[in-house]
Amino acid sequence: MIRGWALQRVWVGLAAVLPLLAHAEAAEEPHRLPLTLAPDDVLATGNEWIALPEIRASDGALVSFNTLFMRERGLLQPNGAAGRPVLEPYLQVGSGKKQPLDGLSWSLLEYWIPQAREERDGLTVTLTYCAPPGHRAAFLRLTLVNHRAEAVSATLGLKSSFGSLSRVTYVPVVLRGERLVAPTPWVDPGEAYSYITYDTRFSWAVVHPGSKATLSMPPVVAAPEADAARTVTLQPGESAESLFVLSVGLEEFSAAHNARALKEELERNGSNAVIAATAAWCRARTRTTGRADLDALMNRNLLFTTLYAWGRTLDTEELVGVTSRSPRYYVSAAYWDRDAMLWSFPGVLDSDPEFARQVLEYALGIQLRNTGTHSRFIDGVVLEDGFQLDEAVAPIVALAAYVRATNDGRFLERYRDAVATLRDRLVSRFDPATGMYSSLQDSQDEFQKLPFLTYDNALAWRALRDLGELYDRLHEGGAASDARRRATALHEAVLRKAVVADAPGAAGPILGSATDGRQHVTTDIPPGSLLKLPILGFLAEDDPLFTRTFEWLHSANYKYSYSDRRYGLPGSYRLPFTSSWTVADELMLKRSHDKAAQILLASPWDAGIITEGIEPDTAVPDKPGRAFATAAGYVAHAICATACQPRR
């Protein structure tokens, strides 16, 4: 089991050097990416401790935020009262009404830090959300510049509200308990919101240097709330800023002092320097293709998979992996080996090899005992049962990719026993009659009556080849030879047993997706598509068997081909649309790269963040699969694998 101290040192050290980093990067202006957003779009930002997944484009309000909790086996998510956002920034000019920021133009600094600007009657308002790495907090900055010919009095404010607390694993479940607001203990000025059952179980705080707050409690209002504001008088050409620090804690003191630490960082170095340091952290994890459009999509999703498929639990300080830290994804905050190791991990390895090492420590630690089981909670306990072969071998494939990329033999030696455990689990699924390996469920998490899945066995072949390499490095010649022998035999078995001779409309034999050695299923399974076989190295892209399979899946003979649709690529009964995995797979194939690239750039996705798929006629993204953090890594990796320039 991974313990937090080793990984914590990395983040604590990072936080300690933030001031130095800010100074070093002061001369480099952060890259600014202008955004075109719809009124109902949201933006996400955050760090390893706190996620801000729903910043509304329409007014800059924060709908919800969350933090990971091992005790809760998922996320804890504060929500505002009666459908309101949890945070609502506003501007009040003179004695007028408090006005939302409803005319914002958005951009991202270094693909991750949301910043919005609004021109209003000779005033410029700028809103920035920033979550510096290493802090159990984020901050919201409001700045105002007076371009008028006369002085102006204005109030910069932030309303906060605590309507409910939800535990999120898959879906939000509202928890029953008491919610209170009170001044932050030993930190002034600020408010601490508490969730209490027999004791405080969670707290969050808003600390606002220079602003004063009015607190309200039921029955006067529906839920605990506060309104923090600062009034300034600006002469022509003058500017002012207000800072609001949002933090999380186990109880009121930790919430307050987590905010205090970031407040002091801001006071010492200034908000511009802290933003610049955060931007520098992001910049160090980006890549370039030489094309601005590809860079924008790739880097936004590299950062999203790094910070939304992975995070640190507030109560145990352990790094954990999840499908997504955003409640917009329909099965958020749970762990799948496939998602973590086959989809997110390649993007993480492209972006940050050191972090990829930490990710593997988690997969080969607390999650190892149930590797291959459908889905688990973040502590490794089974959530949905059912064996899936592709998940069982996923950590082997990821570990081999890491060792190839880094030559980190010491890490491999440390996890020698884990490699043996994974090998034995794979071998236990071997069927002597067919020479293949069985699975209960497929890569789209559905039961398959026919137990031998073609893609899963091709991936198992890849894993056996990888085991041969790993055991060579571990100087275990016998184990290496055995793995290679098994790989060769499996390759032959798949080509003997998984080929369908009479698929309707096919130009010849093609690969089916599943078999029992006699019967076959002719379909595709997009998360574990037959299109991946050349990418795995199992078949050459110009192999006639693969060519016929590719053409059949893209023809009218396959019910879910969507070949007659403008943005159509093969789907399935479970995924009746163009999936993001298929876009990524076809991007990595020579024959379909150009069409996949066109589809990739045609869709708005979820305001630029990868979703589970898009509508084949319009490229409009599906709603249940929004903010899909692990798939974001897979698509970003596909872009990088085909277009990235070498690191300097």
Predicted regions and their residues:
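Well-ordered alpha-helical scaffold segments within catalytic/enzyme domains
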Residues: 283-290, 341-354, 394-411, 458-477, ...
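Acidic/polar, glycine-enriched structural segments that form the non-catalytic walls/loops
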Residues: 25-33, 124, 130-333, 648
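Aromatic-rich carbohydrate-recognition surfaces in CAZymes
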Residues: 240, 331-432, 454-457, 626-646
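C-terminal catalytic domain of Rieske-type non-heme iron oxygenases
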Residues: 378, 565-571, 597-632
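The feature captures the catalytic groove of carbohydrate-active enzymes
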Residues: 240-241, 245-263, 329-330, 375, ...
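Beta-strand-rich N-terminal accessory domains
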Residues: 25-88, 113
